[in-house]
Amino acid sequence: MASAAAGGLPVLFSYFRSSCSYRVRIALAHKGVEHATRAVNLLKSEHKAPEFLALNPLGLVPALQIDGHTLAQSVAILEYLEETRPSPALLPGTPAERAQVRWLCQTICADTQPVQNLSVMNHAASLAGRESAKKEWASHYIRRGLSAFESGVASFGGEFCAAGVQRDEVWH
């Protein structure tokens, strides 16, 4: 896999249907960070190739090469971007508002998104012995998480930080 040299143009390793990659693309655009994108086709198992595993041993997208570093996990990438390129900000101004956005992120990252991951759903189906089990299993947790998310986001409103096209969309 092609990569950026230290100090060169950042390279985002991404899959077009990955919401994790999507949130990093949104953040890079919001912050005006020019970068190259390298497609990693998950359906063709390119994320399992030795070249990609050298970038991210978990074999997950996204991965970002930037400032001489290779970063993985979307929220860690967002935190790095926020700390190294603070303007324009991804997070709102007050500690309470930032905590709210982080809560929303964790609701998606930890409680909702993992169960919609194709590899997790396939594993659930194999355990249950029937294909329909994966959708039932995932739907249960996704509904629960999104319901909590909707309650949390309702307390914001109006600003880019949490409603409409929201920062929590970037951070989840």
Predicted regions span which residues?
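GST-like domain detector, emphasizing the conserved glutathione-binding G-site
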Residues: 2-136, 140, 155
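GST superfamily/GST-like fold recognition
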Residues: 116, 160-172
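Alpha-helical packing segments of well-folded alpha/beta enzyme cores
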Residues: 141-145
